[in-house]
């Protein structure tokens, strides 16, 4: 007797207005062809371009503005990771208006766009400011990046809850008079140049399976780092650039931080087996960054 297999083949899923619970042979073409996407930058199917950087330029921090990065060839950087100065009269900031501040960032990020390879990524850590009124910096940056032609890949919420005091509240105490929200998060905005993907070629990935599954979630939870420990008014923890470097670069790639401050992104790139290039206008912070990198390099040589 011939037995017939009556199991039905699963149909592929499609993106709808209310999402899709699974991803089986998923077809999202009709969704991305909808009018919702008409005015947004589109992925360009262009030839991959990558130009080499002089060896003497690699693994160096320049004490100058990143508004003009003539030391770098166009199409040479694989990843930008940065946290722009917050412009709240911290000692290294100028007192810029909001429009002047946005203009500065746009100038730097336009220059960064030129320096990124096809499919290169730009990751921007930003905190919103103020309460009277609240300034949604991350929204302004997204608007400006899209206007420049960057493709937005998503945003990560950095939950700093463990760094917040559980016994502190702002505004009217136990009253609807004027309760004030306390930000316990920052944003990490993720963009690409021209293409969402990069070809690996002979390069190696270095991210572990468990980390990939965890870090591709849109909420990351780890504490902030003390300014007193680092010696810089607004440092981010090494965990932040480490995750981005592991997710978005291959071993040996080049990481740029155009506002490198104390050099955390540069130091982390070195630890992760990548090259780095940094820029900062404050000589004291360039000195601090180089000192941190030197101490790590000396320690690594000693261990060998």
Feature locations, PLM:
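PRPP-dependent phosphoribosyltransferase catalytic core
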Residues: 291-304
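Core catalytic lobe of class I
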Residues: 1-288, 298
